[in-house]
Amino acid sequence: MDALIRIFASATEVEQDESCARIVGLNMEGPFLDPAKKGAHVEEYIRKPDIEFFRECQNASGGRIKVVTVAPNMEGAEEFIETFKDDVVISIGHTGADYDCAAKAMEKGAHHVTHLYNAMNPLGHRAPGVIAAAADDPLCMVEMIGDGIHIHPAVVRNTFRMFGEERIVLIS
């Protein structure tokens, strides 16, 4: 994980070069993920939510981490969310969390979802999961990869109906 610390430290170095763009924030999507929902992430780097390690990353970045993805079904996630909810956006993602687990994480302060529908259980009529928990939380913002490949266009349209445009962040 020393490599991750070095990567975050490089954000500070890059910003000191006046010829480079200003970094307004960093999105830390990993390593606090559910290995069963890792997607393209390398499993050997995945770890449980770790308060001290995140502090090291945040310090190395000069406080530039603005969003961190956490799988709420992982051991230590609840304490992690409670610790950092006022400092960064806690985003739920790469998770096998069920509805109750996701809803509890949202009650604790995680009010964002990383790429809705991808790397999580689908919305089911008996197992509604993260998707329904996010829809039920009026404070929750959701990201969608709107490229027509990751999510079917009909699902994109229905998600706008379910959440409203003010709660959706389109990402690539």
What feature does the model see in each segment?
Residues 101-172:
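Active-site-adjacent C-terminal substructures of enzyme catalytic domains
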Residues 1-128:
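Histidine/acidic-residue-rich, glycine-tolerant segments that coordinate divalent metal ions
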